Amino acid sequence: MSSKLVLVLNCGSSSLKFAIIDATNGEEHISGLAECFHLPEARIKWKVDGGKQEAALGAGAAHSEALNFIVNTILAQKPALSAQLTAIGHRIVHGGEKFTSSVIVTDDVIQGIKDSIPFAPLHNPAHLIGIAEALKSFPNLADKNVAVFDTAFHQTMPEESYLYALPYSLYKDHGIRRYGAHGTSHFYVSQEAAKVLNKPLEELNVITCHLGNGGSVTAVRNGKCVDTSMGLTPLEGLVMGTRSGDLDPAIIFHLHDAMGMSVDQINTLLTKESGLLGLTEVTSDCRYVEDNYATKADAKRAMDVFCHRLAKYIGSYTALMDGRLDAVVFTGGIGENAAMVRELTLDKLGLLGFEIDHERNMAARFGKSGTITKDSSRLALVIPTNEELVIAQDAARLTA
């Protein structure tokens, strides 16, 4: 089988992750990160042939300068790779209800991404810049750009999962509903879990936990998403690095009316100053929380609230499994590495038959997958996610 090289772009509001991946075997030829956009220290780091390199992009540089650098400097060193590119895959955070699967980028698709900006105000504008710059930089691949949506996997949710108990007209006229996020990751680890369990995906019942700086839990029944913890935006659900997750909506009125905070200040508080950062008042880094759990009250407090919330979501999603749960799967930076989070969470779920195996749990870290429960226990797995591979495979499939 000949190689199918895909350039995968993930444009954030102040960063751009990129990789060239062979969609046939998952081999990564180049990967990198451009960050600190719009700041004096804007820079780019990349790995090629195992060697790491770094360069300044110039003060105030952003997506356009980063893509120029990728094309004219990094790929210029590898003309053979550049010549073999067959497609460009773009990660898109929010596709609204319009996109239920990955699609080739057209004017209509670009308009659909624009229409979803209110639900992803930081990410979707950055994705549109990435698409525009890619079309400019690779005119030969103009019809080979593919959009892969974080929300697409969750479009199989039934109405009872995605509707809020608000006036129905808010959904009909304004699209206010649950959309979820991290769908590409939840889909990937569901596929991988089916392989581990030697089951067809369409017979798989799992609860997948993508835990990183952002986190979400998804109920997967018969291979399809039936519920997920993130909502209209990625603010709902779990305790996250700097996001509050679930709270009583009336807290917002109290902050405004009694404490005189503006809507913008409340938005900043809930999205950038809450979560682990808010609970520790020190850091959003889960490693600090894990390392200091036994000795510092702030770390213990944050960890306990984090795991309590996570266990509640896993427990509630078992009600959606039609009486059969094949496994709970952990992934994402915290899910793959924070053994303490997994242990404290599963310890709360003894009623469901989970019994952690301490040695297995400690072994399944730093990129290693594996079972983390005892042989007599209900199954829990660690599966490192690979969203870039899904994006590359979808791009290759749709442009073949």
Curated annotation (Swiss-Prot):
| One Gene Ontology cellular component | cytosol
Keywords annotated in UniProt: ATP-binding, Cytoplasm, Kinase, Magnesium, Metal-binding, Nucleotide-binding, Transferase
Q: Where does substrate bind?
A: R91
Where in the cell is the protein located? Cytoplasm
Q: Where does Mg(2+) bind?
A: N10, E387
Q: Where is this site: Transition state stabilizer?
A: H182, R243
- Protein's GO biological process: acetate metabolic process; acetyl-CoA biosynthetic process
Family under the similarity heading: Belongs to the acetokinase family.
Check the record and name the HAMAP family matching this protein.
Acetate_kinase (MF_00020)
Q: State what protein this is by name.
A: Acetate kinase
> What is the primary gene name for this protein?
ackA
